[in-house]
Structure formats: structure tokens, C-alpha cells
Amino acid sequence: MTVVTCVFLDHVHHDPAQGDSLIADVTSFLFGQVAGVVQSCVSDQLTAAGDLGLPRGHRLVEPSSRLQGKAIMVALPEDRWHVLTCEHTLEPVAFHLSHVLHESQQRHRRGRRRSKP
């Protein structure tokens, strides 16, 4: 199960099919190094209710609970065999009636040019 800090879930958008590119970007940003080696960062300040979260908005800890002790963040390369691919939804665009009319005119022209069997 993947656990990611909620800060990254809110601000990082990537395609899971890209594999290690996100891991390389995140580790180079956080640690100034290249991915491929396990990197860790220890923090004493990870005590807020929403600091750790699961993908798709689920929370690892309850909002009323507080974490005790130190939290360790580890960046590991993903196993490409267990990555589910998904496509991002497209941005909505304005509907132009002229596009539909143009497409129907092209379809009508193609129909005339075809030879009948």
C-alpha cells in the first residue's frame, strides 16, 4: 500500500505509467540526489491530523488522533509490474456547432465518392 504525504497528493500530478520519473523528481527535489538508492528524511514535526494520507483522498490517521514519535519518509523506485495505468480526464471544452457541421459535410462527401459493390 502506497503512503504519500498529503502535500504531494495535492500538488503533484503524474501518469503512473511513467514509472520512476516521479520518484526521481521527488527525491532530487527533497534530497538533491538521483533516485535509485533508498533515501530517507526524519522529521519530529509530523504531528498534524492530515500529514499522512493514502492516494485518492483516504486518510491514514483519524482527524482526532495525533502521531507520537518520529516519522520517516522513504522514497523507493516503483515496481513497474504493479503499476496500474490510468489516463487523466480531459479538460472540458466549448462545444462549437461549426465543428459538427463540418464533420457531417465531410461524411456526406465521402459517401458520394465510394463505389457501390
Curated annotation (Swiss-Prot):
It comes from the Bacteria. Keywords: Transposable element. This is Mini-circle uncharacterized 12.9 kDa protein.
